[in-house]
Amino acid sequence: EIEQAKQDIDIRTFRQEFEGTFENYAGAVYYNFHPVDNVVKRQIDWTKPLHIGMDFNVDPMSACVSQIEKDKVYFVDEVIIYGSNTDEMVQEIRDRYGTKMQIFIYPDPASKQRKTSAGGRTDLSILQNAGFKVKVKHKHPAIRDRVNAVNSRLKDSKGERHIFVSQSCKTLIKGLQRQIYKENTNIPDKEDGFDHMNDALGYMIDYLKPLTTQANFSSPTRWTMK
């Protein structure tokens, strides 16, 4: 299990979880993001499915749009709508990408109960009724686990990167660069608004390639659909 963990997680997370070292949380939440090595020129391939992470904060509602190739994920677009609801997000996605592409949505697990639109419908049911393939966990992952999952895909222990962001996704890039921890805590700061797109990305990555602080890595999840 330890050898598998070395392959699946980044060095800092490995030291913290397996060697019992104290890791200072000061500074950037997504410390493995590099504005050159993780940023690429990339456009949507209209022949391949879309994988969209989604955060349901209504101001703004945020979605990061990606495509997966083998063990790498490329974020190629982002959707940001202020003062919005799930119906409007669905319409925007359909307007941008049409109805012919296969679309997977990875929303906030709170979507099972949360209702940002009228009519008593949950956010999850709206996405499902729109024809999207919705992939969601039964409950929220620990914030620490979700952040570790993202950092371990931004750069793993071998120095390999598995998450890439198109230059056009300026909000996502800014968020990954600038979100920091609250002083003297391991809680990501949400005051500056960098959290929404980061959370959207995190829900998707945590679903596809989860890590846990219990480090149960004997059967790692690859970039495949459950």
Describe the residue ranges of each PLM region.
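ATPase catalytic-site recognition across NTP-hydrolyzing enzymes
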Residues: 1-54, 59
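Short, polar loop/linker segments at the starts of domains and inter-domain junctions
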Residues: 1-5, 187-193
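Amphipathic alpha-helical surface "interface" segments used
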Residues: 34-39, 219-226
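Acidic, glycine-rich loop-and-beta core segments that form the ion-binding/anion-interacting portion
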Residues: 40-84
